[in-house]
Amino acid sequence: MLNLVDIIRKNQEELKKLKVNNKDLKVLSFSMLSTIEQCMRQYKFNYIDRIETDSDNVYTYLGSLAHLLIEKLYRKEITNKEAVSKWLEKINSMVYFFVDYSKTEQYDKQIELKNKNRKYKNNYNMNMVRYFRNFKPIQYKDFLQEERVYIRLDKVFNLPFFRNYVFNGIVDFIGLNNDGSIDIIDYKTSTMYKGDKQILHSYQLILYAICLENMGFKINRIGWNFLKYARKVRRFKNGNTRLTNVERRTLKYNDEFEDCIVEIDYNVENKKKALKFIFDNVKLMFNIDRVKDKNTNLIPCNYNEFFCKNLCSFYNICNVSR
């Protein structure tokens, strides 16, 4: 049976050697690919100009905290009660807003946004506290957390153009089953994905699975664990069962529930779509890299008011803000 730790470590050492031996190597991440998919100008600001910004926001901050606490819970370094305590300590002392009311000058509007921020924070907090309070580790023969994997794109596409490109990423959780297959789980503190957003983010896990499959592992399942949600189980007298995804804060004390793990179909069709996602966006990167000295504000911008104002760290230096 394949040794999970040894094979992952060997893969990581190979990547280190590639970086040393090929100074032109471009190490791609899902974040880079999704950034250029969203906006080429944002990509240039971030990955070519390397403009320093405070890229943290309430979601990245609390997401990182949740990942850290889950790691410690799986390693039995903290108890459920301690995880709840640490979560509450951090969320109550953080400087980030769910809805930023601090820049609004109109008093009535500020009060409205302040109340909205309080509501979002309370709901989010109740969901996550219930997650940590009810945390139960999934049982595996072995597991790894927060491990880097990679694959050479010239081997994937069999094209010389990609010889200086590799895809890599850090997998939240890899679980080894008794039959030697593996599960890939990504923890999410966000709202559940739907539509195009679900399709886009599925590529991340599919690409991680391709990396691990290339190492010789058989993929059993891949999916997200949406931490704010639970899968409510309702059993009927006729033997039928109904499963409903609900926010954890809505659960009653006697409700039966399980983690809300949303699986992604890992099949040939979806693998092709994920690889096309890489192929198309690497071509965009190549074209932008060729004009790296060009004024970034002359690079095409995919303007979206909500995204630009709330999620893009470069809004204030981008000419769309003027």
PLM region descriptions:
Residues 1-322:
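RecB-family 4Fe-4S metal-dependent nuclease core
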